[in-house]
Every structure is written in C-alpha cells, then in structure tokens.
Amino acid sequence: MGNTSSERAALDRQGGHKTPRRDSSGGSKDGDRPKILMDSPEDADLFHSEEIKAPEKEEFLAWQHDLEVNDKAPAQARPTVFRWTGGGKEVYLSGSFNNWSKLPLTRSHNNFVAILDLPEGEHQYKFFVDGQWTHDPSEPVVTSQLGTVNNVIQVKKTDFEVFDALMVDSQKCSDVSELSSSPPGPYHQEPYISKPEERFKAPPILPPHLLQVILNKDTGISCDPALLPEPNHVMLNHLYALSIKDGVMVLSATHRYKKKYVTTLLYKPI
C-alpha cells in the first residue's frame, strides 16, 4: 500500500502521466526498441556504401593531411615537375594538393608536362588519360588496403638547397654600385665618313707568310709523297685558289685538328 500511495503522489506531481517501468535488463514494458544486428540484411546496404566510399575517404584524408600541414607551418612552395610519357590525346593531373580536381597538362612533343608550386611534404596524385584514371608505373606508388594505387612524391627542402644558395648569392650581388661603370662624359652616335684619299688606296699587300703555299712546295725524295710538310700557323684557315687551267678551278684550305693538319682540295669546273 505504501508503494501505491507514493506512486499516486508522484503521478499527481507529474500531471497524471506515469512513466513506463523498466526491468533489470533495461527493457521497457511498452515494448523493446528495434535493434540493428551486425549480420542482418537490413544494414547490408549501409556497409556496402561504406566500402564504396572508402577510396574517396582515403583521398579526402590525404587532402586533409595537406591542409593540416599548411595550417601548422606554412612551408615554402617548391616548383615540382609532373610529366606523363605514356601518350594520349588529353591528359589531366589530379592529386591531394588540389582536392583531386583535374588540372590539364601541357603537351610538349610526345610528353605532357605541368609545373606546380607544392609545399614540402608527401603528396599523392594520379593521371586522367583519355577518360581513364591511371598512374605512372615508373614513379613511386602507394597502395591502399582496398587496392587503390596512387603515385606519391616527396617534396624535400634538401632537393632545392642549390637553388636557395644561388638565390642568396644573387641577392648579395644585387648591389652593383661598386662595379666599374663607363667613364664619365658625353656620348654620341656619329656615322663613319670615309675620307676622299682613302677611296683610291690600293688593297694591302699580301703578307709574305701567305706566299709560302705548301701545295707549291716540292716534297723531298725521302718523304712520303702523300704527306705534306708541316704548315706555318699563319697559313691555317685561309682559302687558296689555283690559276684556272682547262676550265677547272682548284681551291684549297688547311685546318688543324689537335696535332694533325688536314689540307682539303676542291676541284670546280667552270
């Protein structure tokens, strides 16, 4: 009776509504709520949809990793070259660095190239060639548990130490005030005017060294007739012509190749 009176008093305080009792196992007298079984066919579509979205989830995590790295420490962007050598008509690049959006590549002869400024770290990417997703087997790859294969690239600071050093040197040498400049004074542009006495001058006399043509010299009896004597260095790289005989002009030139001298003859009919 004590319990009945206490329940009745509680009902009066709650407006006459009585909450359902629960047993020791947590069940309600009004009926148990439906439970989702792990192996029931009702949740098969749920797990199937999760398996389908797993690659997209992995790509999203890779993209999210790049965003977290950028938020933590804004690393310096480094020029990175992407090249596709597998042929095709239209090639696009997609990666974790651009939220897996398609970026067209520029055609260069038989290759497709793109240069992007990427922060330091690891980045995944793929190629979209003529409507098909593929990866470059000649570059490093990473494979997920579901078999998704992506190319991976490591952008390291050490790969650009030479360029950084050159940039520092160029900045140090940017001040050219200490360099020698042109002498002070006015500068003009005046055309050359030949003097009247220069017009009637005869051509200069041929230097005597060029008169000693090796083709005009007689070879000694003890020498090989196929070999010519060693020419003087002033005779090199000059064109010599023989007087025209029987309608044929003969031209010759001597060149030096290391320690050897080669004389070439050209016969031209006229």
Swiss-Prot record:
Keywords: Fatty acid biosynthesis, Fatty acid metabolism, Lipid biosynthesis, Lipid metabolism, Lipoprotein, Myristate, Phosphoprotein. SMART domains: AMPKBI. Phosphorylated when associated with the catalytic subunit (PRKAA1 or PRKAA2). Phosphorylated by ULK1; leading to negatively regulate AMPK activity and suggesting the existence of a regulatory feedback loop between ULK1 and AMPK. Residues 68-163 are annotated as: Glycogen-binding domain. The keyword Lipid biosynthesis applies. The modification Phosphoserine is found at S5, S6, S24, S25, S40, S96, S101, S108, S182. Belongs to the 5'-AMP-activated protein kinase beta subunit family. It comes from the Eukaryota. AMPK is a heterotrimer of an alpha catalytic subunit (PRKAA1 or PRKAA2), a beta (PRKAB1 or PRKAB2) and a gamma non-catalytic subunits (PRKAG1, PRKAG2 or PRKAG3). Interacts with FNIP1 and FNIP2. GO terms for molecular function: protein kinase binding. The glycogen-binding domain may target AMPK to glycogen so that other factors like glycogen-bound debranching enzyme or protein phosphatases can directly affect AMPK activity. One of its GO terms (biological process) is fatty acid biosynthetic process. Residues 1-44 are annotated as: Disordered. It comes from Bos taurus. The modification Phosphothreonine is found at T4, T19, T148. This is 5'-AMP-activated protein kinase subunit beta-1. Non-catalytic subunit of AMP-activated protein kinase (AMPK), an energy sensor protein kinase that plays a key role in regulating cellular energy metabolism. In response to reduction of intracellular ATP levels, AMPK activates energy-producing pathways and inhibits energy-consuming processes: inhibits protein, carbohydrate and lipid biosynthesis, as well as cell growth and proliferation. AMPK acts via direct phosphorylation of metabolic enzymes, and by longer-term effects via phosphorylation of transcription regulators.
